[in-house]
Amino acid sequence: MSTSAEDVRGSAVRAKAAAALLAPRSRAEKDRALLAMADALIARSAEILAANAEDLAAARAAGTAGAMVDRLTLTPARLAGMADGLRQVAALEDPVGEVVRGRVLPNGMELRQIRVPLGVVGIIYEARPNVTVDAAGLCLKSGNAALLRGSASAVRSNTALVAVLRGAAVASGLPADAVQLVPGMDHDAVKHLMRLRGLVDVLIPRGGAGLIRAVVEESTVPVIETGVGNCHVYVDAEADLDQALAITVNAKTQRVSVCNSAETLLVHAGVAGEFLPRVLAALHDAGVTVHGDETVCAVDPRVLPATDDDWAAEYLSLDMAVAVVDSLDDAVAHIRRWGSGHTEAIVTRSLPASRRFITTCDSAAVMVNASTRFTDGERFGMGAEIGISTQKLHARGPMGLPELTSTTWVGVGDGHLVT
């Protein structure tokens, strides 16, 4: 039975009302709720793990791939990590009310731009139940109501988690409807959610390229794109090749299933003769299947010929595309054609080369002599993130608490009139 538009709209109406109640709450009130949520996850872990066990049994019965089953799995240690995440969010500064800029006008009127909550944040995501807790915590701390739509494979886990979070919110004096699951697990529920412009203030899809593309193309609610990562490492003619080798292997293999893992290596022709044999051997030793252009294939018989699909791929696996380029500008042209605007890295000892790369790469993050894996809210010192935006409006790069706010202009006068 398909989910009705009225059911989804009803949840959004309740979320809108909860957002209005949540917006003026103090940091102390919100932090108290976050800490209560963390404690409740541990206190009620048995029922959460029991619900998760049902999801896991259903996933295995359906023949779900092992990697997906792992993402779906909750353990006492993972629950403890989720609880710690909420405590860390509680320790972060509250962005609401922060003065972004301010001045006194010539007429004596005080003008300030301050941060305010977005309102109702809808998050559409795939199999990871931890996103339910992470998203709810970040939304609550930034004064927003969270309307959560996880995957059908995690419905029992997410239902149990949200019940625990809502109970802790109410016990702390906050509205229960500040955290809700979108009713229904069919595609109609998502379609209805995407049509609720005016009730839902923003949608944030987290998942694969297909999910993100569908939401961007079909939603009338404003969308922040996150996460698709075809990240590049460019080894310049003036690179420290030992450093380039270490950065390439780290960027590709440290954790392959994340959006800031490098998928393509570009090597300047001036150092290709020396560097390619070393890096190809290191990648093969790490279990990486290399897909290369003609020059790369000629160096190592284990290299597979690359196609356009490889240059465009977000592998999220032990695969890497490798090409030789004649110049920095050719590397940037390749990135602009095939990249996703996530993170690019240059390895070079040349300051002019690094500056040119920074100013010509059109990406959310650019690393100089560092791994692409650094693009992350925690590693940037921002705290937890709700995703990494690859678009240019409203936020770009890791999205922490400030990126879950908008701004209001406040003018303070003393009987000031316009003449």
Curated annotation (Swiss-Prot):
Its EC number is 1.2.1.41. InterPro entries: Ald_DH/histidinol_DH (IPR016161), Ald_DH_C (IPR016163), Ald_DH_N (IPR016162), Aldehyde_DH_dom (IPR015590), G-glutamylP_reductase_CS (IPR020593), Glu-5-SA_DH (IPR012134), GPR_dom (IPR000965). GO terms for cellular component: cytoplasm. It is found in: Cytoplasm. One of its GO terms (molecular function) is NADP binding. Keywords: Amino-acid biosynthesis, Cytoplasm, NADP, Oxidoreductase, Proline biosynthesis. It holds the Pfam family Aldedh. It catalyses: L-glutamate 5-semialdehyde + phosphate + NADP(+) = L-glutamyl 5-phosphate + NADPH + H(+). The keyword Oxidoreductase applies. Coiled coil: none annotated. Pathway: Amino-acid biosynthesis; L-proline biosynthesis; L-glutamate 5-semialdehyde from L-glutamate: step 2/2. GO terms for biological process: L-proline biosynthetic process. Its main location: cytoplasm. Belongs to the gamma-glutamyl phosphate reductase family. Catalyzes the NADPH-dependent reduction of L-glutamate 5-phosphate into L-glutamate 5-semialdehyde and phosphate. The product spontaneously undergoes cyclization to form 1-pyrroline-5-carboxylate. This is Gamma-glutamyl phosphate reductase. It comes from Frankia casuarinae (strain DSM 45818 / CECT 9043 / HFP020203 / CcI3). The lineage of its organism: Bacteria, Bacillati, Actinomycetota, Actinomycetes, Frankiales. The gene is proA.
